[in-house]
A protein has these predicted regions:
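Hydrophobic beta-strand positions that form the internal "hydrophobic ladder"
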Residues: 73, 121, 181-184, 225, ...
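Beta-strand-rich domains and repeat architectures in extracellular enzymes and scaffolds
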Residues: 51-84
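A flexible loop/linker signature enriched in serine peptidases of the S9 family
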Residues: 76-86, 101-108, 123-150, 159-172, ...
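Serine-hydrolase catalytic core recognition
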Residues: 322, 336, 404, 411-727
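Residue-level detector of Asp-centered blade-edge/turn motifs that repeat once per structural unit
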Residues: 68-69, 116-117, 179-180, 220-221, ...
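Bacterial N-terminal signal peptides
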Residues: 19-22, 26-42
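Short loop/turn segments that connect beta-strands within beta-propeller blades
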Residues: 89-93, 153-157, 196-200, 241-245, ...
C-alpha cells in the first residue's frame, strides 16, 4: 500500500509518500522522509544564518529630545511595532521605559517633547490623516482610530489624553511646550490648539484664524504665539497675544512667509519669505528667498538678506530642517543655504550685513541642528571628511571652524545637549541604532540592554564603499554587500532608495524606512545575493548639481543611466553571474525598478517594485491638455509605461492602498498593461497600510517576499505565471 501524509516543514506543507506496508518500517521511512525533506532547508538555514524577523528585530530609536532645564533626554523605541517613550538622566544616562504600549498596532509616536524641568513627556500618537481626513488604520480595526496628544509623567502613572490632533500631512505633528511647562500647543485641522499638560481641561482652539495655521512658536515670556497662516497661494506670519486676545500680522504680502522664530529676549522675530511661486526641483522653477526681522518695539519688519536668483540661490527645501533656522546668542540668526552649491550653515547679524559661512567645504549638513544651551554654538550632523557616513560636529555661531565630536566607522545623527553632555543617535555597519553619549574617547551606548540577545550582528557583513562612473562620466557612490560565503557566480541585486533626496550609507540609516531597508539588504546578502545599493544622481550629500540634474525624473530620467552603470559594475565582478542581475526598491526606487525592467529586461532578469511611480504624466492632470504639453510628453517618455512593449522580465508589485505619497492608482493602472503585454508578475496589496509601513509585520512580509521572489526567479529559475489578457 502506498502511504501518504502531509507535514509542515519550514513553514510549508510537504507531501510525504512512503511505499511501505506498516509498522516500524513505515515509521522509519516516514522519519527518513521527513529528514530528507528538512535537509535542504536545514542547509539553507545554516547558510542563511538568521531570519528576516531577526534582521528586523531590533528597537529603532527616533525623536531624541532633551529638557531645557534638566539633564534628561527622551526618545522613542519602535520595537517590532510597539512604540514607547524612554528617558535617561545624566550623567549616567541609564535608560528606562516611560510608556508601556504593547503589540504591533500601527500607532506611531511623533513630536516627542519634554517639559522644561523634564518631569513630563508630551507626544502625538497615531498617524496624520489622508486626503479624506482618515487616520491610518493598518490593522483594519473596525473602530476608526484618531491621532491624539498625550502626556505622561516620567515618575510613573498612565498617560493622560490632552486632545485630538488629526493633522493633515506627513510630518505635520508639531507640539510646542510653553516656557513655564504648563501648556501644550499644537496645530491641526487648520487651527491652533491649547491644552494644560495636567489634562485637567480639554484642549481648546486658541482663536478663530482664517487659513491653515501651522508652525506655532511661543514667545520667551509665554505671552504671545507666532505662527504661519497658510492662505493657499501666499502665507502670512501672525502673532496672537494672550493678554489682549488680539491678532497681528507681520508685514503681510503676496509671498510665502514661514518659520517664525523669536530672539532669546523676545524683542525680535525672524522669518523666511519665499519670493518665487511654487518651487521644487520637479517643477523646474527657481525659488529665491529672503530673511526678514520684525522688531517688536517699532512694529516694523525689514529684509536683512536675499538669496541670488539662480539655482544655487533657490531655497534648499529638499534638505531643510526647520530647526536650522533660529535665533542664536549675540543677536545672530542661523540659516541654511546652498549658495556655493552645497547645503551649509550660515549666520548673519539680526541687523543685516554679510552672512558668515560656518561650514565651508565640499560636503553638506543633514539632520537635526541644535543650539548649545548658551546659544553660542551649533551641534549638527554632516558628511564632512566621510562622504558616505555622517558624524556630529560643533561650530560657533560667530566663527567658522567646525570641530568633529565623533568620527570613525560609525554613523551619528540628531545631536542634543543634556546638562554638559552631548547625546546623539548612532549606528554602525553591523550594529543597529541606539542613543549614545558622546565622550572625548568616542561614544557610550545608552539603553543597550534593549537590543535583543539573539540579534545577529556578528553575522552581518560590512558593506564596501564603491565609486563607479556613469556613461556621462559622473561619479556614483554605492555600498556593496558581499555575502560572507558565496558561490563562484552569485546572483546580484541593484537597490535604489526612495525620495529621491536621500542617501544610503555604510551602516544603519537614520530614517525608519531606510533603516529597515538597510537591514533587508543585509538579509539578502545572508541569502547569498550580492547587493549594490546605489546613490544615483538626485541623491543628497554630493552637491546641488548632483541632486538637481537638468534632465532628472519626469524631465528625462537621466538618473537611469546610473542604474545601468551599477548593473554593469556588478556584471564585471568575478564572483557575480552577469546573467542573474535583479533590482529592487521602494517609492522612487520602485519607479527605477520598473524603469529598469521596462527598458532593459535584457540586463535585469527580475525586479521587486514597492510603491513605485509608473506614469509621470498622470501628475500633469491627464486629458488633452496634458497630452499636448511638452512637459507631459517628456514625463511620459521618462516613465516605465512608455517602454511596456520591451518589458519581459518578471516583477513583484507591492503597495499599500492607503498610500499618501504615491497614488495607489499607479499600480492599479500598471497591472492591466502588464496583463495585456503578457508580462509575468505577482502582486501583493496591503489594505489600509500607508507608504512607509506602520506595521512591523508588513515590513517582514515585504522583505520576506522580496527574498523569496528573487530566490525563485534568479536562483532556481522558476517561471512566474504570465496572466493572459482579460477578454
Amino acid at each position: 500500500m502506498m502511504h501518504t501524509g502531509k507535514v509542515w516543514v519550514g513553514g510549508r506543507r510537504v507531501l510525504l509518500v512512503c511505499p511501505f506496508v506498516s509498522g516500524f518500517v513505515r515509521l522509519t521511512a516516514i522519519a527518513a522522509a521527513i529528514f530528507l525533506a528538512l535537509l535542504p532547508q536545514v542547509l539553507s538555514a545554516q547558510a542563511q544564518g538568521f531570519t528576516i524577523e531577526q534582521a528586523l528585530g531590533y528597537p529603532y530609536p527616533y525623536g531624541l529630545t532633551t529638557a531645557a532645564h534638566a539633564a534628561r533626554i527622551a526618545w522613542v523605541f519602535n520595537s517590532r511595532g510597539s512604540r514607547n517613550v524612554w528617558v535617561a538622566d545624566g550623567p549616567g544616562f541609564t535608560g528606562r521605559q516611560v510608556t508601556h504600549y504593547t503589540g504591533d498596532d500601527g500607532m506611531p509616536i511623533a513630536s516627542l517633547e519634554l517639559t522644561p524641568n523634564g518631569s513630563t513627556v508630551v507626544y502625538a500618537r497615531g498617524s496624520e490623516t489622508n486626503a479624506q481626513g482618515e487616520v491610518a488604520d493598518p490593522t483594519s480595526d473596525v473602530h476608526q482610530p484618531e491621532q491624539q496628544v498625550w502626556a505622561a509623567d516620567v515618575s510613573g502613572g498612565e498617560p493622560r489624553l490632552l486632545g485630538t490632533m488629526n493633522c493633515g500631512f506627513e510630518g505635520c505633528e508639531d507640539i510646542q511646550i510653553s516656557p513655564d511647562g504648563r501648556y501644550a500647543l499644537w496645530s491641526a485641522r487648520h487651527a491652533l490648539w491649547l491644552a494644560p499638560i495636567t489634562g485637567a481641561e480639554p484642549a481648546r482652539q486658541l482663536a478663530y484664524i482664517r487659513g491653515d495655521n501651522v508652525q506655532p512658536q511661543w514667545s520667551p515670556d509665554g505671552k504671545s504665539i507666532a505662527f504661519t497662516s497658510d492662505r493657499g497661494a501666499y502665507s502670512l506670519i501672525g502673532i496672537y497675544r494672550f493678554d489682549s486676545r488680539t491678532l497681528q500680522y507681520v508685514d503681510p504680502s503676496v509671498f510665502r512667509d514661514m518659520l517664525p522664530h523669536w530672539s532669546p529676549d523676545g524683542s525680535k522675530l525672524a522669518f523666511i519669505r519665499l519670493t518665487g511661486g511654487e518651487g521644487g526641483f520637479f517643477s523646474g522653477r527657481l525659488q529665491p528667498w529672503t530673511i526678514w526681522v520684525w522688531d517688536a518695539a517699532s512694529g516694523t519688519a525689514s529684509q536683512i538678506w536675499a538669496s541670488t536668483a539662480d539655482a544655487n540661490g533657490s531655497y534648499p527645501g529638499d534638505e531643510w530642517e526647520g530647526d536650522a533656522f533660529q535665533f542664536a546668542a549675540g543677536n545672530r540668526i542661523v540659516f541654511a543655504s546652498q549658495a556655493d552649491g552645497w547645503v551649509h550653515l550660515y549666520s548673519i547679524a539680526a541687523a543685516g550685513g554679510a552672512p558668515m559661512l560656518l561650514t565651508p567645504g565640499a560636503f553638506s549638513f543633514q539632520g537635526g541642528v541644535t543650539l548649545t544651551p548658551d546659544g553660542k554654538a551649533l551641534l549638527y550632523a554632516s558628511n564632512q571628511n566621510d562622504t558616505d557616513r555622517r558624524h556630529i560636529w560643533r561650530v560657533d555661531v560667530d566663527h567658522p571652524g567646525p570641530v568633529a565630536l565623533t568620527h570613525g566607522e560609525s554613523i551619528e545623527w540628531t545631536p542634543v545637549t543634556a546638562g554638559t553632555a552631548v547625546v546623539c543617535l548612532g549606528s554602525t555597519a553591523t550594529t543597529p541604532a541606539l542613543p549614545y553619549r558622546v565622550t572625548p574617547q568616542g561614544r557610550e551606548p545608552i539603553a543597550a540592554s534593549a537590543m535583543p540577545n539573539d540579534y545577529p550582528s556578528a553575522q552581518l557583513v560590512t558593506p564596501q564603499q564603491v565609486v563607479f562612473k556613469s556613461p556621462d562620466g559622473l561619479e556614483i557612490h554605492g555600498q556593496l554587500f558581499v555575502p560572507r560565503s558565496h558561490a563562484q557566480r552569485s546572483p546580484a541585486l541593484v537597490f535604489m532608495h526612495g525620495g529621491p533626496p536621500r542617501q544610503m550609507m555604510l551602516g544603519f540609516h537614520p530614517m525608519d524606512a531606510y533603516n529597515f531597508m538597510y537591514a533587508a539588504n543585509e538579509y539578502l546578502a545572508s541569502r547569498g545575493f550580492v547587493v549594490l545599493s546605489v546613490n544615483y544622481r538626485l541623491s543628497i550629500m554630493y552637491g546641488r548639481e548632483f541632486r538637481e540634474p537638468a534632465q532628472g525624473g519626469p524631465r528625462g530620467a537621466s538618473e537611469y543611466q546610473d542604474i545601468v552603470a551599477a548593473a554593469k559594475y556588478l556584471q564585471a565582478l568575478p564572483y557575480v553571474d552577469p546573467q542573474k542581475i535583479g533590482l529592487w526598491g521602494g517609492s522612487y526606487g520602485g519607479y527605477l525598478t520598473a524603469l529598469g525592467l521596462a527598458r532593459n529586461s535584457d540586463i535585469f532578469k527580475a525586479g521587486v517594485d514597492y510603491a513605485g511611480v509608473h506614469d509621470w504624466s498622470a501628475f500633469f492632470g491627464g486629458g488633452e491638455a496634458a497630452a499636448a504639453s511638452d512637459r507631459a510628453k517628456i514625463a511620459y517618455q521618462s516613465s516605465p509605461v512608455a517602454s511596456i512593449d520591451k518589458w519581459t522580465s518578471p516583477v513583484l508589485l507591492l503597495q499599500a492602498d492607503d498610500d499618501r505619497n504615491v497614488p495607489f492608482s499607479q499600480t492599479v493602472n500598471l497591472v492591466p498593461l502588464l496583463r495585456a503585454h503578457h508580462v509575468p508578475y505577482e502582486l501583493t496589496v496591503f489594505p489600509d497600510e500607508v507608504h512607509d509601513s506602520l506595521l512591523w509585520r508588513t515590513w517582514v512580509r515585504v522583505f520576506g517576499a522580496t527574498a523569496d521572489f528573487f530566490e525563485r526567479t534568479l536562483v532556481k529559475g522558476e517561471a512566474i505565471h504570465t496572466v493572459p489578457p482579460e477578454n
